[in-house]
């Protein structure tokens, strides 16, 4: 899943990064609102749409590994929606940490560091184990 540094469209990523960050923040906000009222599926559905938007933007920029990472975030949100994972504060904190981890990773890639998705592994692993 690693890409060669030249495969990443850094200018495109720099342009898309605010959109990705905003989509992640909106998804987290929607999940938090849903956790306050779990009966309303509209909020969590909106969160899934925001995650799809962010995932697509990362694919456009050539970051397949980061897009896959968002898939793990989406899997946890889907597990919340299905009731497979309870909306506990620790789970919501994990979603927040996952978004922050990805945002920091993207900024490092924009600044010229190699796209090495393995850097996302520690949080990715926790996301997958939780979902």
Task: List the predicted regions and their residue ranges.
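Short, well-ordered alpha-helical segments
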Residues: 43-47, 60-76, 90-98
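Structural secondary-structure packing elements that flank or coincide with functional cores
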Residues: 1-10, 84-131
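Long, amphipathic alpha-helical coiled-coil segments characteristic
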Residues: 5-49
């Amino acid at each position: 899943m690693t890409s060669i540094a030249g495969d990443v469209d850094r200018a495109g990523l720099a342009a898309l990064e605010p959109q990705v960050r905003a989509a992640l923040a909106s998804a987290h906000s929607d999940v938090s609102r849903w956790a306050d009222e779990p009966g309303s599926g509209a909020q969590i559905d909106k969160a899934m749409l925001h995650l799809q938007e962010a995932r697509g933007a990362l694919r456009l920029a050539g970051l397949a590994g980061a897009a896959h990472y968002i898939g793990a975030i989406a899997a946890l949100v889907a597990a919340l929606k299905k009731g497979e994972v309870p909306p506990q504060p620790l789970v919501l904190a994990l979603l927040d940490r996952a978004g922050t981890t990805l945002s920091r990773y993207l900024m490092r890639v924009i600044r010229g560091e190699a796209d090495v998705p393995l850097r996302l592994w520690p949080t990715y692993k926790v996301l997958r184990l939780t979902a």
